[in-house]
Swiss-Prot record:
Co-factor requirement: Mg(2+); K(+)
Function: Catalyzes the formation of S-adenosylmethionine (AdoMet) from methionine and ATP. The overall synthetic reaction is composed of two sequential steps, AdoMet formation and the subsequent tripolyphosphate hydrolysis which occurs prior to release of AdoMet from the enzyme.
Species: Gluconobacter oxydans (strain 621H) (Gluconobacter suboxydans)
Catalysed reactions listed for this entry: L-methionine + ATP + H2O = S-adenosyl-L-methionine + phosphate + diphosphate
Record-given protein name: S-adenosylmethionine synthase
Gene name per UniProt: metK
């Protein structure tokens, strides 16, 4: 995203009932089941969902007894999302598991022994980003797109009269106007939400207009002719009955809405030895702490890894010209020094070997507030602020 000058920028989001997000939810349900039984379990679970059909595939290493519970757990996940429709129902869906043992060739490069550090589970590049555009240090278009769908979910699941008739599948898209690189207003909003047969589109529009007005900053009003609700008309057939869904297909929604680079790796269904997930969380953690410390208004972090190698091959910092008298190369070295960026170091620092991943499967992995019971989203903490300021002043 160009962060200077005047421009329009758009981000989209999808709800927990979107087919790809249903797949993500089930994959993370499998992951949490294994981590609950064994914090050192290995999981790489892919899910396919379509009309009353769910297929699990991938590799695992963990307690055998967990396997026998997975179909019931997947069914409960579908129930919690809200699907009990003719074409996709938690009661009737045919759920099949093809999960099998993790490759020994991968395990020998990843497992730690007495004479070596634990290596990364694969090669790859991961990015983290933070910006002062919102209080959560997230890009504003994505933040508002996510929040709109979370509000609709709350109406639907919490018994609010405004949610009556709304169904789980939904999408949003928000376009903001930037002046001198800063968001100053909204130019368009698109929302498509599944609903019961016969529900008035005018009623849906009025409800969603109230949602949007309650979320956007004061003075930001979307023009009526640029406020699009179910633009194609009825949206009754949705979810996996309307479109097949796959794990890992919404990686931009999961991260920064296109405002920052993406290394290409998905998150859901992967245990934290997979640096696609854990290193992306670490990169966000570092970038957020840099911005929270007042060292820059924007920060992009890139980390890179090789399979079987414990330390990152590179740590790259880009402050996009917003640094406060900070040398980016020196800052990168400091970040690599104050946090152990090996796979095990990341997991230990952020306490990732726990069943904390189901809540990440929808509405974004970043910019989220932790659940006090789960103690999750640890990568959103800003506990490095004092350390970074002190290190730069040495």
């Amino acid at each position: 995203m160009r962060n200077h000058g005047d421009f329009l920028f758009t981000s989209e989001s999808v709800s927990e009932g979107h087919p790809d997000k249903v797949a993500d939810r089930i994959s993370d349900t499998v992951l949490d089941a294994y981590l609950q039984a064994d914090p050192e379990a290995r999981v790489a679970c892919e899910t396919l969902v379509t009309t009353n059909r769910v297929i699990l595939a991938g590799e695992v290493r963990g307690p055998k007894e967990v396997e026998d519970t997975l179909i019931d757990r997947a069914r409960e996940a579908i129930k919690d999302i809200g699907y009990d429709q003719e074409g996709f129902s938690w009661k009737k869906a045919d759920i099949t598991s093809y999960l099998h043992a993790q490759s020994a060739d991968i395990a020998q490069g990843v497992d730690s022994g007495s004479d070596k550090d634990e290596g990364a589970g694969d090669q790859g590049i991961m990015f983290g980003y933070a910006t002062r555009e919102t209080e959560h240090l997230m890009p504003a278009p994505l933040y508002y797109a996510q929040t709109i769908l979370e509000r609709i979910r709350d109406y639907r699941k919490n018994g609010d009269a405004r949610g009556v008739g709304l169904l789980p599948d939904a999408k949003s898209q928000v376009t903001l106007r930037y002046v001198d690189g800063k968001p100053v207003g909204v130019t368009s909003v698109v929302i498509s939400t599944q609903h019961v047969e016969g529900m008035s589109q005018n009623t849906i529009r009025e409800t969603l207009r109230d949602v949007v007005n309650g979320i956007l900053p004061e003075g930001w009003t979307c023009p009526e002719d640029e406020f699009y609700v179910n633009p194609t008309g009825n949206f009754v057939i949705g979810g996996p009955d309307g479109d097949a869904g796959l794990t890992g297909r919404k990686i931009i929604v999961d991260t920064y809405g296109g405002a920052a680079p993406h290394g290409g790796g998905a998150f859901s269904g992967k245990d934290p030895t997979k640096v696609d997930r854990s290193a992306a969380y670490a990169a966000r953690y570092l970038a957020k702490n840099v911005v929270a410390a007042g060292l820059a208004d924007r920060c992009t972090i890139q980390l890179s890894y090789a399979i079987g190698v414990s330390k990152p091959l590179s740590v790259y910092v880009d402050l996009d010209g917003t640094g406060k008298d900070v040398d980016e190369a020196r800052l990168g070295a400091i970040l690599n020094e104050v946090v152990d960026l090996s796979p095990r170091g990341i997991r230990k620092h952020l306490r990732l070997n726990r069943p904390i991943y189901v809540p990440t499967s929808a509405y974004g992995h970043f910019g989220r507030a932790p659940d006090p019971v789960l103690d999750n989203f640890t990568w959103e903490q800003t506990d490095l602020v004092t350390t970074l300021r002190g290190a730069l002043n040495r």
